[in-house]
Amino acid sequence: MRFFHFYTPEQVPSSGIPECAVAIDVLRATTTIATALAAGAEAVQVFAHLQQLQEASQNWPASQRLLAGERGGKAVAGFDLGNSPLDYTPDRVRDKRIFLSTTNGTRSLQRLEGIPVVITAALVNLGAVVDFLRRGSFAEVWLVGSGWEGAFSLEDTACAGAILHRLGCSLNQLGNDETLAALALYQTWQDDLLGLLRRSSHGQRLLGLGPENDQDLAYCADLDRLSVVPRQVQPGVLASGG
């Protein structure tokens, strides 16, 4: 396997698509998606725009759907859920379709939806993702961070580096400078991932919204907490796969 890392969806090439792409948004969309599916959600359907989400959700029975939205780190008024993974408990989400839109992560997923195999990764399901990639033996894999409104994200690149580290990638498998940088970043911070999340600009942004968000950071930094691999089963729809 040969790996390429892109800091944001805006950096993703428009041609030469790989066999597999991994969308990463540690704070917090891909952590939340993994948590929702591990808690028994039927699927998570992602949208870049809130209006599209609201329109599509009307085609789903009210008793079997939940609207989840976040903008600027805050829950969208009138929605059932925000983007805190701690809110996605089995009693709330089991057997429900989650209609989700976030500031960054859902844009990344929509950018990748035409690739044959699309999965999502976070620190909480790192081991499951690594096992999936090992079994797949894809010739080329893109690791795509979500960033923050088009800018670099420390935690997403660290997660990409964690995947490369766990896979034991050789230098020949690192397809661009960003993969080498990601690997170096993770190896520097691997013993203090919560510290990295707290120091990241988005971590600081969440803590500025309320000290209770430190619980989210601790959860998002908890390596291998979940064994689920969210996989795209149709454009924009993720279910438990692998």
From Swiss-Prot:
Catalytic reaction(s) noted: (2R)-O-phospho-3-sulfolactate + H2O = (2R)-3-sulfolactate + phosphate
Alphabetized InterPro entries for the sequence: ComB-like, ComB-like_sf
Key words of the record: Hydrolase, Magnesium
Enzyme Commission number(s): 3.1.3.71
Keyword Hydrolase listed: yes
Cofactor(s) essential for the protein: Mg(2+)
Keyword flag Phosphoprotein: no
A GO molecular-function descriptor: 2-phosphosulfolactate phosphatase activity
Annotated family: Belongs to the ComB family.
PANTHER family: 2-PHOSPHOSULFOLACTATE PHOSPHATASE-RELATED
Matches recorded under NCBIfam families: PRK00886.1-5 (NF002056)
Name of the featured protein: Probable 2-phosphosulfolactate phosphatase
